[in-house]
Amino acid sequence: MARLQVESTINGEAKEFLCDADQSMLDVLRDELGLTGTKEGCGTGDCGACSILVDGRLVCACLMLGVESGGKSIETIEGIADKDGLHPLQRQFLENAALQCGICTPGFIVASKALLEIHPDPDEETIRYW
């Protein structure tokens, strides 16, 4: 099968990569681009461990094809940290021991960032059903 050339913006940087037509964005991030912070949990889009932002929208990377990222802006957990250190969300996760084994944590942080960008002061119901 011929590999396809894709151009995207990943964590603020223009990237060009080759991927198979049926390769998930999760596999592209991890295997082609070396961005291993995004993890696979369930592989069916139910758990959110593989959450990324695509043009600011929360997406499960396991459900998106890599070729679909062409011309889009992708943000992963690696792109969330401030240049001078941790993003405030990452700091709060650490300070409040909001961690378990670590597989889901990157996705939780990405999803939390997406929530707070849309709802800066969410109530409990908004958080619960986000």
Sequence positions of predicted segments:
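Signature of N-terminal electron-transfer/Fe-S-associated modules in redox systems
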Residues: 1-130
